[in-house]
Amino acid sequence: MSYDPKKIDLFPTLPGVYLMKNEEGEVLYVGKAKNLRQRVKQYFVPGRDGRLMIPYLVAKINYIETIVVTSEKEALLLENNLIKQHKPRYNALLKDDKSYIALKISQNDAWATVRLVRYKGTPEPDGLYFGPYTSAQAARQTLDLLNRLFPLRQCSDQEFARRTRPCLLYQMKRCVGPCTQKCTKGEYQQHLDRTIKFLRGQNKDVLKDLYEEMRLLSEQLEFEKANHLLRTIRYIEKTIESQYVDRPLGHDADAIGLFRYGEHVVVVLMIFRGGKLVGSRHFEFDNIIEEDHELLTSFLLQHYEGATEIPSEILLPSKISDEHPVEEILSARREQKVNLQIPQRGEKKALIEIAQKNAEALFKTQKDEATLREKTLLEMQELLFLTNYPTRIECFDNSNIAGSEPVSSMVAFTDGLKDSKRYRTYRLKIGSKPDDYAAMYEVLTRRYKRAKEENDMPDLVVVDGGKGQLNIAIKVFEELNITGVDLLGLAKEAGRHDKGMTAEQVFTCYQKEPILLKANSPILFLLQKIRDEAHRVAISFHRKRRSKKTLKSALDDIPGIGPAKRKTLLTHFGSLKKIELAADAELREVKGISAANIEAIRTFFQGRKE
């Protein structure tokens, strides 16, 4: 039943948020308005709103909920929270499943270090983060530079606790030796403060500090230390000079570009820190009914809520209606003023144009790649006589060594791309005797018995192997009474066991002889990619299983360490090597480990060395 627009006449004329829901109660869209009645009415006036997706949205609306607030700022915050909570299909929602790289300075360490870390979504609030960087290489280059300039410790906490004399880095003047009290807390903090300033682009402040310290050392006749500082100063000045070429800004800023094609939107974020372009990120949105100014507002609130840093200036491609409330919210999060600007000329305008061109180029590239993938899948359907268009493909591979720890993997590809959320690994229950057919029978039965119950069938199933493995798949599907799923077996050409792009045989259910695909076939390339991914996942899982078994076997030999304590130790430390290197104080932190157990652990590892 469609929504009756007459109900809107009862809506308040106050600012607030509205939630459009379908018959099942699913939230389809969340919006905000200065005047709820006036804004919601616009959706139901024919031709009033020209956005293509509006008729589709309106046709699905069964109920509209409104929430009145006291200000535009409150409406913005509530809208952002409701979008994150309900994940409406027609709103722009940032996904947090990507992994990002940053430099982290822990705030919990007495002697803090700079570490390269990866995180998803919002990072842990236990340190200062600098980034994200576009690549691990860029982050490592920055970390290497910091290690050359500022002598902070680089060792692990375990190594730091065990040190009785300084390491080689101390002799090289790359560390001030806090592990053996070669410096005071105040001296170490001074180096840490300079590191933070440098990462924030406050190079002039760092140089000023270093020049002042060098002057004091010279007055105290500490010429060797003063000379070392001078070398550091020259290195920083040289680094700064080399960066002027690609430093269009003199401060922290982000430049945002946006490209829209119908209801598909690409947003590009160019990140400048200390005036230098340190990276860029892109975000894609589909089925978006929000106008550009609404999408930009939503993007700003979502992105900078979980960002490691908020710059002092954000450059936008177009005006947003909620500019001042958004500035207030971002300034409160940063605890310093944040300016939103729409540049009209000069260098800043040029940066926005570059971001816009990047967004457009990215969209066109992805569109071309999507077209090629679709063409390959259509050719696969035709050439391999598939009943279904292979939107979702699942592939299986088994792994064992002489029957030990047999496992299987299942990988999934959707529209020709990895769909890692659907990956599965299986510990097999077959006996110790190697039997690839029994392994394939077990894993296929387990997977598709459940898939049938959950109505979660793929379009195509690929098994790694020839006619024999395909026959196992056919048998399983017949026993489970499953129809409508295509089955293929993939095997190298008879007599060929080499790696790489070689001709392969594809076995189908419809003909006795295999189909031979040429080495340069895009269909073969995709099938090999899927099969190799299944093999990689199976091998990785098998190694993990064997590693755990080896760890358990090794710890079995320690007197007084039973199954419960063994499991606790492995859970706490993660590896045999870390248990061996752990200090007594760290071992005492493990629940249930006594002084006698620690002595037994020490004796055990000492015996292994001898």
From Swiss-Prot:
A GO CC term attached to the entry: cytoplasm
Main subcellular location of this protein, as a coarse class: cytoplasm
Coiled-coil intervals in this record? Answer: none
Q: Name one GO molecular function term.
A: DNA binding
Protein location: Cytoplasm
Q: Where's the UVR domain?
A: 204-239
- Record keywords, A-Z: Cytoplasm, DNA damage, DNA excision, DNA repair, Excision nuclease, SOS response
Q: Does the keyword Protein transport apply?
A: no
Source organism superkingdom = Bacteria
Q: Which Pfam families match?
A: GIY-YIG, HHH_5, UvrC_RNaseH, UvrC_RNaseH_dom
- List the GO biological process terms: nucleotide-excision repair; SOS response
Q: Which residues form the GIY-YIG domain?
A: 13-92
Family membership noted in the UniProt record: Belongs to the UvrC family.
Q: NCBIfam families under this entry?
A: PRK00558.1-5, uvrC
Q: What does the subunit comment say?
A: Interacts with UvrB in an incision complex.
Q: Which HAMAP family match?
A: UvrC (MF_00203)
Function, as annotated: The UvrABC repair system catalyzes the recognition and processing of DNA lesions. UvrC both incises the 5' and 3' sides of the lesion. The N-terminal half is responsible for the 3' incision and the C-terminal half is responsible for the 5' incision.
Q: This chain belongs to which protein, by name? A: UvrABC system protein C
What species is this protein from? Answer: Protochlamydia amoebophila (strain UWE25)
